[in-house]
Amino acid sequence: MRQYCLLLIVLALAAALSDNAVASTLAVARSEIGAPSAVYSERLLRSEPQDEDTFEDRAFGLNWLRLRWLRLGAAKAKTTDVISARESKWIEAWANKNLSPNYVYKQLGLAKQGDKAMQSQNYRIFEAYTERLFAKDQALYTKWLDAKMTPEDVYKALKLDKLLGAKAANSPDFRRYEVYMFKWHELN
């Protein structure tokens, strides 16, 4: 059934395009009968000459199809920037688990894509996740600064003092501690 529909569409398109060719050859043939020196390339029904920008085909022009494709493409471009409810649940779950951005980047398959990762549909999810983490961290820094916590207090609050040696430096919270220490020293 699908093949017949496709065949019907192709035949209709060919007929419509050939109808325009037949109309122009008929105009030339009729003009040679009446006055051999005058050759008309447009339809005989027009009373005033038309330029190419306003020329209309007898069956239909393909400009409406191009315009529709452009409109659909623009609508699709607008919707791809919006994160769906399902994707926002993923982002929230990842933020609650405190997953590192590098881990999420790999899980979304962006590491395999190399330079083309920014063109992927998953890249907008990654951007939304990093923005969510950034907002979460900024709220923490503001809370700690308002409470006038020293870097040592934050170190203990993040429980980095319980980790031994190099384990503290490998912890995801250690980066938060470093950023807070920088912000605290800027203000004091």
From Swiss-Prot:
Family indicated by similarity: Belongs to the RxLR effector family.
Domain notes: The RxLR-dEER motif acts to carry the protein into the host cell cytoplasm through binding to cell surface phosphatidylinositol-3-phosphate.
Biological role: Effector that triggers cell death in a variety of plant species (including tobacco, tomato and soybean), regardless of the Rps genes present. Avh241 interacts with the plant immune system via at least two different mechanisms, one recognized by plants dependent on subcellular localization and one promoting infection independent on membrane localization. The cell death triggered by Avh241 in N.benthamiana requires the two host mitogen-activated protein kinases, MEK2 and WIPK.
Keyword terms, alphabetized: Host cell membrane, Host membrane, Membrane, Secreted, Signal, Virulence
Motif Host plasma membrane localization motif, residue range(s) on this chain: 73-78
Pfam families (alphabetical): RXLR
Disulfide bonds, paired cysteine numbers: none
GO cellular component: extracellular region; host cell plasma membrane; membrane
Motif RxLR-dEER: positions: 43-58
Top-level taxonomic group: Eukaryota
Signal peptide: 1-16
Cellular compartment(s): Secreted; Host cell membrane
Protein name per Swiss-Prot or TrEMBL: RxLR effector protein Avh241
Major localization class: secreted
